[in-house]
């Protein structure tokens, strides 16, 4: 059954449940599909604990977890989250990258000694991930530094936009960075999209604006400069998605705003048309 049918569950886009805990539950009920975070903020986590949580989730899902990570957009709600966690917002890039390196060290199963932001002495993680070395890590972000970082260090690139043409140009930069690092072809191209499908385009547009402002605590017009959104009729939706596929995206993640049941049927048709 869907969350809508059960009626005592929330859609993941409606509330911010604990990501890895929620995915562990989904992994136990859904045996085939890939699962991922969009995106997890490693800078907010202790990497020793994060490495253990992710390894456990990868075991529960039998290797179906994709670890989407990011440094977080500079918006009021996210700054407030960092402040509440006692983590300096301006240090988030360094914390993320070092934290991920420490996670990967633990995922080898070998004893770990670490002397950096975190101190670790002769420690071993158990269980290790289902996949040797850990799950694939996809990096979000569209800034120039994020593109280079994805090409040099990550297994996938996972931004929230911009439009298909802009995504294609940025994807070229990611691929060039990967090639320069000796990693040609090692990065998966993905994109995270927000959609509201309705014959009344103005209504759909307003729903997206309301959702974004509530979620991020910032005017929608600012958020939409860096996040790709579709608001309009079904007939225009698949061609819009196809623009990203033609630009090189192999994975399309869709955040739905509006009636989820009707959107699921439309997404299924779009998937079949694009395959």
For each predicted feature, which ranges?
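Single conserved hydrophobic/aromatic residue that forms the stacking wall/gate
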Residues: 1-15
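Alpha-helix-loop-beta-strand connector modules within alpha/beta enzyme cores
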Residues: 16-36, 95-102, 268-275
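Aromatic/hydrophobic pocket-lining residues that form the small-molecule binding cavity
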Residues: 19, 23, 50, 92-96, ...
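Short, well-ordered coil/turn segments that N-cap beta-strands
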Residues: 30-35, 60-65, 108-112, 130-136, ...
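Active-site mouth loops of central-metabolism enzymes
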Residues: 40-47, 132-142, 196, 224-235
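Flexible, glycine-rich active-site loops centered on histidine and acidic residues
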Residues: 43-113, 165-166, 172
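C-terminal amphipathic alpha-helical "assembly" element
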Residues: 58, 66-68, 77, 87-88, ...
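Active-site glycine-rich loop that binds ribose-phosphate moieties when present
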Residues: 118-125, 141-145
């Amino acid at each position: 059954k869907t969350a809508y049918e059960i009626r005592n569950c929330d859609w993941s886009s409606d509330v911010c449940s604990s990501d890895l805990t929620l995915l562990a539950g989904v992994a136990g009920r859904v045996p085939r599909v890939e699962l991922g975070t969009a995106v997890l903020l490693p800078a907010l986590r202790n990497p020793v604990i994060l490495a253990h949580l992710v390894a456990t989730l990868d075991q529960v899902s039998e290797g179906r977890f994709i670890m989407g990570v990011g440094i977080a957009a500079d918006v009021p709600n996210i700054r407030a989250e960092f402040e509440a966690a006692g983590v300096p917002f301006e240090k988030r890039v360094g914390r993320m990258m070092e934290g991920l390196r420490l996670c990967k060290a633990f995922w080898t199963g070998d004893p770990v000694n670490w002397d950096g932001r975190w101190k670790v002495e002769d420690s071993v993680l158990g269980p290790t991930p289902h996949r040797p070395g850990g799950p694939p890590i996809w990096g979000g972000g569209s800034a120039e530094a994020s593109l280079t970082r994805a090409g040099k260090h990550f297994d996938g690139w996972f931004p929230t936009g911009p439009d298909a043409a802009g995504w294609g140009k940025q994807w070229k930069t990611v691929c060039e960075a990967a090639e320069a690092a000796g990693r040609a072809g090692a990065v998966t191209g993905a994109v995270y999209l927000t959609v509201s499908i309705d014959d009344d385009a103005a209504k759909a547009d307003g729903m997206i604006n309301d959702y974004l402002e509530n979620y991020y605590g910032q005017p929608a017009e600012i958020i939409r400069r860096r996040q790709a959104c579709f608001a309009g009729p079904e007939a225009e939706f698949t061609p819009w998605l196809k623009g990203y596929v033609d630009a090189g995206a192999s994975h399309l993640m869709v955040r739905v705003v509006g009636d989820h049941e009707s959107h699921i049927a439309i997404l299924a048709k779009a998937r079949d048309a694009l395959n």
